[in-house]
C-alpha cells in the first residue's frame, strides 16, 4: 500500500503536464513551420495523373486532380494563350491546363481574363470575378480553332487595355501568364518586350510558359526573372506538371498572421505567412500596411523576407479592442494584395489568458498535499529533544545556566570472592638480593612452614636471598616453635625488612623473577633431593637441597626481569622479595604436576594475597627479630 500512495502524487503531476500544452498551442508559441500539407496532396495528385487516360470519362479524371493549393488572395489574373497554327490538335490539352489552373483560384476577390493571340489578339473573357461568366468563358475557349502566326505582342496589348480599364482606381496587383509553343520572329519578339515592360509599369508581374518549340532565351527575357519562367520539354501533355508550381508562385495571398492578438502599449513584431513573396523585384520595395480604418493607415518596412513569410514591426496599440487588417505590396505601393486575417489588441498582464491558470489551480492542492506529507514525516521522525533549540531564542535577556552535571554512575558491585586456596603462597620479604656476595647456603628449609601452616603440605622447600649483611642467615627455629598449631594460609612477617610470606591455597603456575644477577638455579628431575645451585660468581657455587621434588624446574636470575618455568602444582607457593621485586616459586612435593611453563608478570606487580573472606580466619602475623637467624 505504501508504494501506491507514493506513486499517487507523481501520477497527478504527469496528468497536469498533459494539460499544459493546449494553452501553449493556442498562443501560437509552438507553431511548427514544416513542409506544407500541399506537398502530400501533390503527391496524390501526381499518382492520379499517372493513371489518366483519354476516354469518355477523361474530363472527370482531369477534374479529380484539381485538389491542389487553393489561392485565397486578391489580385487580377490574365491568361495570354497562343492559338497559332503550330498548336494544331494540342488545343484541347492547353484548354484542360487552363481549366485546372482556374480551379485553383477560388477566392471571390480574384478576377480573371482570357486572351488569345495569333496574327491578332482577342479577349475571350473580360476581367471578371463572376463564377458564371468565368464558366462561360471556359466554354468559349474550348471551341477555339488554332490558326495564324505567333504574335505575342498582340496579346499583351489586350491585357494592358484591361489593366488600364479595370485597375485605374483600385491598386490591385496583376498577374500575367503568357504562353507560347514556338519561337517568335525578331520584330514580334522586340514588340513583345516593349509591351511587357508597359505592363510592369502598371504593376503587373509577368510569367512565361514555353511548350514544344519555344526559345528559352526569348521567354526568359519577356518574364520578370528566370524564376518566373516555366518550360515544358515533353509537349502539351506535360503541361499539367507545372500547375502546382505555377499556382504557388502566381498566387498572392496571406495565409496567416502571428500573433492573432497583441498587448496594448507594448512593442511587438508581426509575422506574415503567405504565397507569392518571390514576385518582389527589389527588397526595399516591399511594404507592410496596417489598416485600422479609412483614416488610420500605417506602413512599415519588413525586417526579414523569404519566399513564404516576412517579419514586420507591428504598429503601437493604444487601447484594448482595436483591430486592424494587413496588406502587402511588392512594388513600392503601386499595388497591394489584401488578406482576410486581422489582429486585435488586448490588455496585457498576468490575466491575459485564463487558460494558463487552469494547471496552476490544479497544482495548488497537489503542492499542499506534498508539503503536508513532508511535514508529517518530519514531525514523526524528530525526537522530543530537538524542540529545545526553538525555546532558546525566547530567553534572550538572561543566559541560560549550564545544565547540571549528570549523576555519577552507581558503584560497581564488589567482585566475587576468590576461591579458597588449599595451598598457601609464601611471600618472603628480605633485605634484598642486591650486592656482590649474592646468595649463600640457607640453614634449614621451608618444610617447617608447611608443617606449621597445614598438614596437607609436606616438606616445602623454601628460599631466600641473602640479607644486606654478608654472612647472615635466617633461622626458622623461632617460627617453628610459635607456629606449630597454625591453620592453613598464614601470613609470616619478618620485622627486619617488613617482608611478608603468604601461603594462598590455589593451583597456580610458579613464577620466579630475580634481578641484578645472572644466576641460574637448575633443578634436575628426580624423586627427591634435587640440588638448586645459585651461581653468584666463578669462584663460588652454592647449592640448596630440595627434598622429594617430583619435578625439575629451572630458575634463571638476571639483571633484568628474568623468567623461569616450573611445573604447575596444586600447592604452588611463591616467594616474593620486596626490596628488589624478586620472586622464588616453591613447589609442594606431594602435589606437583608438569604443565607448560609460563613467564612471570612485570616485576613491579606483587602476587595477590589472601581473599578478604580468608583474612578473618588467618592468625596474626608472627614477627621474628632480625638478630635470631642462625649462621
Swiss-Prot record:
Ranges for region Disordered: 382-413
Gene Ontology MF: a single term: transmembrane signaling receptor activity
Biased composition (Basic and acidic residues): 388-397
Gene3D superfamilies in the record: von Willebrand factor, type A domain (3.40.50.410)
Family annotation (PANTHER family): ANTHRAX TOXIN RECEPTOR (PTHR16059), ANTHRAX TOXIN RECEPTOR-LIKE (PTHR16059:SF16)
Topological type in the membrane: Single-pass type I membrane protein
Keyword Signal annotated: yes
Family: Belongs to the ATR family.
Signal peptide: 1-27
Keywords, comma-separated and alphabetical: Membrane, Metal-binding, Signal, Transmembrane, Transmembrane helix
Binding of a divalent metal cation, residues: 84, 86, 150
Protein name: Anthrax toxin receptor-like
Transmembrane domains' residue ranges: 354-374
Residue intervals on the Extracellular side: 28-353
Claim: Membrane is one of the keywords in the record: yes
Subcellular location: Membrane
This protein's GO CC annotations: cell surface; plasma membrane
Biased composition (Pro residues): 398-413
Origin species: Homo sapiens (Human)
Top-level taxon of origin: Eukaryota
Domain annotation VWFA: ranges: 76-246
Stretches in topological domain Cytoplasmic: 375-631
Amino acid at each position: 500500500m505504501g508504494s501506491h500512495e507514493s506513486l499517487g502524487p507523481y501520477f497527478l503531476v504527469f496528468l497536469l503536464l498533459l494539460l499544459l500544452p493546449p494553452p501553449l498551442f493556442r498562443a501560437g508559441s509552438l507553431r511548427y513551420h514544416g513542409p506544407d500539407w500541399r506537398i502530400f496532396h501533390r503527391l496524390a495528385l501526381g499518382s492520379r495523373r499517372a493513371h489518366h487516360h483519354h476516354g469518355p470519362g477523361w474530363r472527370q479524371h482531369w477534374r479529380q486532380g484539381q485538389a491542389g493549393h487553393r489561392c485565397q488572395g486578391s489580385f487580377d489574373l490574365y491568361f495570354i494563350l497562343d492559338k497559332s497554327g503550330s498548336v494544331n490538335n494540342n488545343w484541347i490539352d492547353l484548354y484542360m491546363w487552363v481549366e485546372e489552373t482556374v480551379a485553383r483560384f477560388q477566392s471571390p476577390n480574384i478576377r480573371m481574363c482570357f486572351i488569345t493571340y495569333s496574327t491578332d489578339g482577342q479577349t475571350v473573357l473580360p476581367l471578371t470575378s463572376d463564377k458564371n461568366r468565368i464558366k462561360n468563358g471556359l466554354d468559349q475557349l474550348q471551341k477555339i480553332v488554332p490558326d495564324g502566326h505567333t504574335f505575342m505582342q498582340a496579346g499583351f496589348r489586350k491585357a494592358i487595355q484591361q489593366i488600364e480599364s479595370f485597375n485605374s482606381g483600385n491598386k490591385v496587383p496583376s498577374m500575367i501568364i503568357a504562353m507560347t509553343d514556338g519561337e517568335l520572329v525578331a520584330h514580334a519578339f522586340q514588340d513583345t518586350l516593349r509591351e511587357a515592360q508597359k505592363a510592369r509599369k502598371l504593376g503587373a508581374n509577368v510569367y512565361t510558359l514555353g511548350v514544344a518549340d519555344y526559345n528559352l532565351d526569348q521567354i526568359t527575357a519577356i518574364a520578370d526573372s528566370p524564376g518566373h519562367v516555366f518550360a515544358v520539354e515533353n509537349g502539351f501533355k506535360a503541361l499539367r506538371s507545372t500547375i502546382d508550381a505555377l499556382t504557388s508562385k502566381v498566387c498572392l495571398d496571406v495565409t496567416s498572421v502571428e500573433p492573432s492578438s497583441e498587448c496594448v502599449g507594448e512593442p511587438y513584431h508581426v509575422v506574415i505567412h503567405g504565397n507569392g513573396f518571390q514576385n518582389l523585384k527589389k527588397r526595399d520595395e516591399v511594404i507592410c500596411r496596417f489598416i485600422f480604418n479609412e483614416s488610420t493607415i500605417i506602413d512599415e518596412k519588413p525586417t526579414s523576407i523569404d519566399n513564404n513569410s516576412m517579419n514586420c514591426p507591428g504598429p503601437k496599440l493604444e487601447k484594448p479592442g482595436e483591430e486592424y487588417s494587413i496588406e502587402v505590396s511588392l512594388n513600392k505601393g503601386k499595388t497591394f494584395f489584401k488578406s482576410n486575417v486581422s489582429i486585435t489588441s488586448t490588455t496585457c498582464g498576468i490575466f491575459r489568458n485564463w487558460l494558463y491558470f487552469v494547471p496552476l489551480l490544479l497544482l495548488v492542492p497537489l503542492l499542499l498535499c506534498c508539503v503536508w506529507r513532508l511535514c508529517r514525516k518530519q514531525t514523526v521522525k524528530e525526537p522530543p529533544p530537538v524542540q529545545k533549540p526553538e525555546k532558546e531564542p525566547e530567553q534572550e535577556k538572561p543566559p541560560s545556566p549550564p545544565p547540571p552535571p549528570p549523576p555519577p554512575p552507581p558503584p560497581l558491585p564488589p567482585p566475587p570472592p576468590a576461591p579458597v586456596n588449599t595451598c598457601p603462597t609464601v611471600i618472603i620479604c628480605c633485605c634484598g638480593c642486591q650486592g656482590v656476595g649474592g646468595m649463600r647456603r640457607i640453614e634449614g628449609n621451608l618444610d617447617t612452614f608447611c608443617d606449621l601452616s597445614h598438614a596437607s603440605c609436606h616438606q616445602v622447600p623454601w628460599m631466600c636471598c641473602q640479607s644486606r649483611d654478608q654472612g647472615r642467615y635466617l633461622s626458622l627455629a623461632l617460627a617453628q616453635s610459635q607456629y606449630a598449631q597454625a591453620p592453613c594460609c598464614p601470613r609470616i612477617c619478618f620485622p627486619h625488612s617488613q617482608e611478608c610470606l603468604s601461603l594462598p591455597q590455589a593451583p597456580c603456575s610458579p613464577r620466579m623473577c630475580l634481578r641484578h644477577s645472572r644466576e641460574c638455579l637448575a633443578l634436575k628431575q628426580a624423586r627427591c633431593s634435587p640440588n638448586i645451585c645459585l651461581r653468584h660468581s666463578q669462584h663460588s657455587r652454592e647449592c640448596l637441597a630440595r627434598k622429594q621434588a617430583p619435578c625439575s624446574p629451572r630458575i634463571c636470575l638476571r639483571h633484568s626481569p628474568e623468567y623461569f618455568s616450573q611445573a604447575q602444582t596444586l600447592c604452588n607457593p611463591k616467594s616474593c622479595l620486596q626490596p628488589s621485586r624478586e620472586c622464588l616459586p616453591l613447589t609442594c612435593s606431594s602435589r606437583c604436576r608438569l604443565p607448560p611453563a609460563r613467564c612471570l608478570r612485570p616485576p613491579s606487580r606483587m602476587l595477590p594475597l589472601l581473599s578478604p573472606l580468608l583474612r578473618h580466619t588467618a592468625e596474626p602475623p608472627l614477627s621474628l627479630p632480625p638478630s635470631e637467624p642462625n649462621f
